[in-house]
């Protein structure tokens, strides 16, 4: 928990150019609670730069919606 005793939200990302998975959990003490999850899948027909822009915009939207305190990225 953070200093105000509210759950900490963590955004996890499983990156990929074809599909990027994401999930948000809330952590309160030893308790984890699922908040939301999804997959971002830019069209394969898009040029590389446009696929990156789709990923950027979608991840920015997830961050704006769920306001995570931390982000973890899978290697």
List each language-model region with its residue ranges.
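Phosphate- and other anionic-substrate recognition elements at nucleic-acid/protein interfaces
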Residues: 1-75
């Amino acid at each position: 928990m953070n200093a105000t005793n509210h759950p900490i939200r963590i955004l996890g990302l499983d990156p990929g150019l074809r599909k990027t998975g994401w999930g948000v959990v809330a952590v309160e003490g030893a308790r984890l609670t699922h908040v939301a999850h999804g997959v971002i899948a830019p069209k394969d027909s898009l040029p590389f730069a446009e696929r990156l822009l789709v990923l950027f915009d979608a991840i920015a939207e997830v961050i704006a919606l769920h306001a995570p305190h931390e982000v973890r990225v899978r290697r």
